Structures are given as structure tokens and as C-alpha cells.
UniProtKB/Swiss-Prot annotation:
Capsid vertex-specific component that plays a role during viral DNA encapsidation, assuring correct genome cleavage and presumably stabilizing capsids that contain full-length viral genomes. Participates in the interaction between the capsid and the tegument through interaction with the large tegument protein/LTP. Heterodimerizes with CVC1. Interacts with major capsid protein/MCP and triplex capsid protein 1/TRX1 at the pentamer vertices. Interacts with the large tegument protein/LTP. GO terms for cellular component: host cell; host cell nucleus; viral capsid. It holds the Pfam family Herpes_UL25. Its main location: virion. This is Capsid vertex component 2. Residues 1-47 are annotated as: Interaction with major capsid protein/MCP. GO terms for biological process: symbiont entry into host cell; viral genome packaging; viral penetration into host nucleus. Belongs to the herpesviridae CVC2 protein family.
Amino acid sequence: MAQCNLFYQYPITPILEGHVRNILICTEEDIRRLQSQSSLRLREKIDQGHRDKLLRMRLKTELDALQRKMQKDSDVLNSHLKAIEDALLFTNDGEVNVETKADTQLLPKSPERLEKFNQVAITPLDPFIRFTDDFRGEMINTFFNNAQMWNFTFGSWFYKLKRVFYNEPGLRRALKITNVDSLTISKELLTVTVNALEQATVYPIFGSEMSDLEAALCILAAFYSTYENSQIDERTTLVDIITLLPVIFRLLGSEITALKNVSPSGTYFGFNDPSCMKFFVPMRKGKHYAENTFGNHVLVKMLLGRGVMQKIPGEKDSQNFDVEARLHGAIKNDVLVYWTYQLMRPKLGNNVPIFIHDQHYLRSGLVAIESLFLLWRILNSESLFNKRVGKFLLTSIFPQLENVDFAENNFEAGNIQNFEYLMHHYVVPMYNLQNDISISTLFPGLVAVCVNESVRLGWEHKCAGAPSDAVQVQSKENPFVEYIRAQMEQQADVAILEKHDCILFHFENGLNITLSFTLPRQRLFAMASSLFNVNDTYDFIYFLVLGFLPIPAII
């Protein structure tokens, strides 16, 4: 049997014997351990599910709150945009219909709706423009908000300013000047430049009780009252004088023509300032200019001839006149004092200045008269209904407007009233909104053209007495560059004031040069066309009011 053992015995001795039921033997301890581990894993899964649920609920709550906040902010933004659109665009009876992008109905015209806003109109071809407080600033903001997809040029003058400031790193960053080769300019540069134009006739330091516009209206009212058929009395207001400006300027033009016939050299609109005069404020006690400053001014001669003024400011006898005027008012004998008191008493009470004594009011008033008289001579020289050659369209600022061409070929106008319309629908509302508004704030474009005309001829105070046939080179750069640089660099107040007054003196001289021409329109249009994109009367009117004229450019 020993030989058969291999057939019934295992060749290897088993270490672990198999269970009777062929299953593994597991102790109670192992089973409890496995159950505990399973319970822990299950508990972790349940807790993780609760945490995920809480996080999802919290995320949903935050998303709902964010959605509500975004909806609220969106509603506020939409209401602001709607208010801006309503403030800037509306139509009234007899004007061009304006449609918005969101609604095809005409904008409301109820007085309750309109009284919340201020409104002006520039030309009879366009609808009224509504604004809140700052007309020109809101126009600039509206233009740049709507001009994202286009490139616009503002003329070579603005482009030269951009190139000058581009070479100065500090000003380049502050004015956000990037691409010097592009004809367009930044919003910051345009805003700073237009602000400098607006401040030309606003004296920043010397406290004035009345603006140059108010002083001019007082002088014109006194002049007009010397005619028998004048339409003014004690109830007349400054607004009434503004509406009467066309009538007054026709009389004024006749007087100037009469003086010119007597003396061809008698149409001088300048002032005889001493050489190297730097500041506009009178240096003699802060009230009087040098003797003979007003002696050759044609408007002063005319006022003396009409009996509006008793003495030429600066004469020796005028000192006694000043004392008498201060003590007794001189209401009976002095027409200018009387009408200044009548027109300014509602605003100033009894503290009404006398122009012969406070001569800066007389000088600023004469400059304002020159400005308005020049506009009267230019704006009514061509009808807006003629075939246009200019490229400016109001849709450049307001894309919602519909381009309507009112021009006619070979149109012959019988009664052009561009100046009258501008006075009634622009100057009067602006004066009612801000009764200390000045000429440069009303017409910054006029300041730009006249100052550049004076700078182009190289005029300076020290050259004021040079012969008329002498040619003066330009020894200084653009005065606006120096003024803007002084403001941006926060230089001393005296330095800023000197550069401001340099612009003011150039403006006075530019008016004198332009008014001395028989046809000043051609002179101004030539300057405005080469520097500011002006090509016709429509362009010129908008440039006068805005101080800039955006024209689409293909770059």
C-alpha cells in the first residue's frame, strides 16, 4: 500500500483546513468593526449631501439678490438715459419731428414735463435742445457717448493743441492723448479747451457785480433811449433789451457810418492801453485805466455825441463828475447812470456801479457790444435755407435725429432773421438760467476765431502803436496753450491771471481788427474754415455756440 499512498494522500500538508460549509469564519469583533466603518461612511455621505444642499440654497439666494440689484441698477440707468434723451431731444409745435430709438411716438410736449428742463434752440431748422444745468458740458458728454463707432475731426487748431500737449508727458496723461497721428481728440482735451474759451471774458479774481453782457445792455438801452421813437420805458427789463438788439444795432450802424464819413480813421474799436500792459483790472485804485484809454474808441465817441455820456473816461474834469455822481446819483443829467440804475436795481438794489467811475464795467460792456454787433452783421448776411456746403450735421451729436434737408437751390430770402432767432431762443433762456453769464460763455467760438485772428497778426501790447503798414512776426505760441498749461500745472494765481488776460486782450484786438473791415464775414469765415471746419452760416452758428464743430472723418 505504500506505493499507492500518493493517490489518496495530499501531496502537501494543508495549513488551513476548509470549513465544513465551505465559508470563512468571521468573528463578532470583525463584524462590528465593518458595521462601524460602513456607518461612518454613510454618515459622511449624508452630511456632505446636507452641506451641498445648504451651499446650493445660499448660492441661489445670492444669485437672486444679485439679479435684483442688477435689475434695480439697470432700471436706474435706463431712467437716467431716458431723462437725458428727454432733456436733449423734444419737439414742439411747428418744429421738426424727432423720434427716439425705443419709441416711435413724439416726445411729450406738456408744460408740466418741459418745465423740469432748460431748453434752447440754435437755428430754426433744428428742434429745441433740452439740458439740465451745464448746456455745453452735457452736449460734449452726449457727443462722446454717441460717437464710439466713428472718428471725428475738430479742425486743425484742435489737432495742433493735441500735438503740443502730446510732447508733455504729464499733460498727455491728464488729457488722455494717445494716438498723435489721429485727427480726433479726447473728451478731456476738448472739455479743457472749451472751458478755456468760455472763461475768456470772465474775470477770475476781480469781484464784479454785473457781467459784461449786462453792462453792454445798459449802455445800449441808454443809447436807444436818446431816440424819440424808442420802445423802452421804466418797466423795460434786460430781456427786453436783448429782443430789441436788431433795432438798436441798425441805429448803431447808422451812427458808426456817419462817423466814418466824417473821418475814415474814426472807426477804431480798440483801446489805447499803455505798452506792455499785462492785466485787465484797472491799476489806478482798481477803478480807473490810464488817461486816454477810451479816447479813440468809436463807440465812446458815438455815446458822447448822443449825450449818453458826459465826459470821456480819463479826462481831468471827470474826477469832479465822479464825485458828483457818487453824491447825488446824477440821474437827471446822465443818461447812462439813469438806465443802469433802472435796469440793474432789481438785481443790485441801490448798489449800482457808475461806469465812468468803475471803468472795467465800461470796458467790458463795450467789448460785449462789439461782439453782439459783429454777430448781427454776420449772421443775417446769408439765409440758412440756401443750398448747404458745410459738412456738420446735428446728427453727429444726436444720432436719433432724422436728417431733413430744407435747403433749396437758388433760394432768395427776403427777411433773414438768424440773429433774432438766436437771441430769442438761445441768449434769453441762457440769461434767465444764469444772469451773470458773459459773452465768452455764450459764444466761445467767437472767442476762438477773434483770438486766432489777433495771434495770426502777431499783435502785442508793446506793438499797439506800430505803423499800420508794418508786419509783426508771431513771437509767442498759442495763448490758450499757455493758459491751459498754467491751469493744469497749478501755477501761481498771478501767472494764471496774466495768461488769462493775454487771451482777453487778444479777443479785444481781434474784434477791433474784424470790425474794421467792410465785410467782416469773409474775414471770419476764412479763419474759421481753415481752423475749425466751418464752411457755411449753419456751421458758423453752431461753432459760435458750441466752441467746436465735429465732422466725420475717414481714417
